[in-house]
């Protein structure tokens, strides 16, 4: 039993980690790391703003695991492209608002760093929303140019 698990484990691990090399995988990983850094900066200065970083880090980690393990093809009751688009769009808007409020308040160095990193996170989430937009990914087929009824 242990030998069969050992033989299938590298294949499973390779399948799971191959997602992290894609553009979407890299973006989700960067979102998780950036949310963690912003959380650390907010927790040292003002803990009231850390809720956004915690929630977005959890959501990004959930989507990372779902896409990494290919669960989005197995769980089809959820429309994953639209869910991911709305997650990133809401995160970009909330990070933009929160960062502007934090930078206007002017606090200590870690609060200013969190505000500046929040603006970077808003840009990252906005870019992720742009590339995730489901209607942008649909390909339109060209209309037929030949007459269907024959020569006129």
UniProtKB/Swiss-Prot annotation:
TM spans (from-to): 25-45, 48-68, 85-105, 112-132
The keyword Transmembrane helix belongs to this UniProt entry's keyword annotation: yes
GO cellular component, as recorded: membrane
InterPro entries in the record: Marvel, MARVEL-CKLF_proteins
MARVEL domain boundaries: 19-137
Membrane topology annotation: Multi-pass membrane protein
Keywords (A to Z) from UniProt: Glycoprotein, Membrane, Transmembrane, Transmembrane helix
Annotated localization: Membrane
Residues with attached carbohydrate: 108
Role played: May play a role in cell differentiation in the intestinal epithelium.
Name of this chain's protein: Proteolipid protein 2
Gene transcribed to yield this protein: PLP2
């Amino acid at each position: 039993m242990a030998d069969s698990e050992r033989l299938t484990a590298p294949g499973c691990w390779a399948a799971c980690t191959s997602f992290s090399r894609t553009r979407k995988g890299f973006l989700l990983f960067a979102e998780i790391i950036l949310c963690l850094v912003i959380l650390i900066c907010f927790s040292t200065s003002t803990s009231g703003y850390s809720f956004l970083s915690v929630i977005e880090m959890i959501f990004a980690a959930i989507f990372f695991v779902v896409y990494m393990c290919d669960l989005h093809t197995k769980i089809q009751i959820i429309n994953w492209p639209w869910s991911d688009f709305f997650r990133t769009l809401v995160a970009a808007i909330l990070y933009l608002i929160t960062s502007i409020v934090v930078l206007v308040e002017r606090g200590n160095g870690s609060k200013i760093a969190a505000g500046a990193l929040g603006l970077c996170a808003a840009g990252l989430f906005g870019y992720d929303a742009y590339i995730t937009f489901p209607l942008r990914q649909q390909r339109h087929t060209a209309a037929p140019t030949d007459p269907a009824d024959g020569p006129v």
